[in-house]
Amino acid sequence: MKYEMIREIFNQCSNNQMRDVFVSEVDTEDPELVLMNYIKTKEEIIDKTIHPDGTVIFNVVCSGLRQRYSFTPDD
């Protein structure tokens, strides 16, 4: 299955609310396997949300940085 993956890295600096955003297309049956290429352990996953439209969102803290990975099915 193809997904649009959006990786957001939140800036922790005060007065700078911009975040780094990376968009890519991935082909996988399990978005969590793709996520594990970016993080070290499953313990870094804070929560996982599955929306009715099939979108899977992971909130993680990796190396002290808060990140969000969104996988939206590409119909």
Summary of predicted features, one role per range:
Residues 1-2, 55:
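Short, surface-exposed beta-edge/turn micro-motifs
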Residues 5, 30-35, 67-75:
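Hydrophobic alpha-helical membrane-spanning segments
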Residues 29-47:
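A short, charged, amphipathic alpha-helix used as a generic interaction element across diverse proteins
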Residues 41-75:
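Short, mixed-charge low-complexity intrinsically disordered segments
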Residues 2-32:
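N-terminal acidic leader/helix
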